[in-house]
């Protein structure tokens, strides 16, 4: 029995109708109610999710479906009680699902392979717009240099929200490193504390961005003194057309599994992907370590709630 009485329009539990309570009144005394929950059908071709989400969730010949059963309940249980038991099962099945999520980089590579070849992926009004495959090729080129120039695990990034910022973040993850995005609006004490706590020795930034910061927040410049500063403009000048082309071609022709092996150095979803620091407004900033699994779980949750439409832009 499906007490909601209809297919979900949002992927979440709806109101439980009380018809099953009446159905259970006239059955034998040994009858029980076994709550169960289905996870993994939202985004399938038979769900009422958006066409965009169905495309994003397309997984070839198989998809992960979890069927979770709970403890048998008395036949006298009401709709509120049974819904709570089903809700508990939804939480348990979600936790099980999260255990099998890929790393951020593996998920990104998979999405790039599914993306339309000529469709815009990144644009900021400053840099040239990029398609998904060109964005991955650029990040791949940068990641090789990050691995060569920065042997340490935690990498500091001082960049605005931009195409370059996105590429540097993803390149750092492709290199198997941990991202530490520094808050350029914070004061010198907060920035220094964050850099020391994360044991950051190398900071990637942009000359153009630093020139702007000098006019707005001089504290940032003093904090950078003594650190190994690498400018994205310098990395970009090292990347020649041939390198970009061959990496782009590999992205287009290599099987996804092989592509993940050759360009991605992060394969453990429990590895720390990013360290986020508080603003430091109430004392020294506090760092929160987020694994690939943590962030992927949040991405999946947001995707389910938003039910992405074709015209949506972030």
Name every feature range the model reports, one short phrase each.
Residues 155, 172, 203, 272, ...:
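Conserved S/T- and glycine-rich ATP-binding loop of Class I adenylate-forming
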Residues 174-248:
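Structural core segment of the AMP-binding/adenylate-forming
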Residues 106-131, 149, 273-276:
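AMP-dependent adenylate-forming
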Residues 116-118, 229-277, 284, 304-313:
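Conserved pre-ATP/AMP-binding loop-to-beta segment of ANL
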Residues 21, 25, 135-142, 255, ...:
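Conserved structural elements of the adenylate-forming
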Residues 6-77:
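A cross-family acyltransferase "interaction/gating" segment
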Residues 128-134, 265-267, 273-297:
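Conserved AMP-binding A3 loop
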Residues 120-149, 153-170, 187-192, 250-253, ...:
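Conserved AMP-binding/adenylate-forming core of the ANL superfamily
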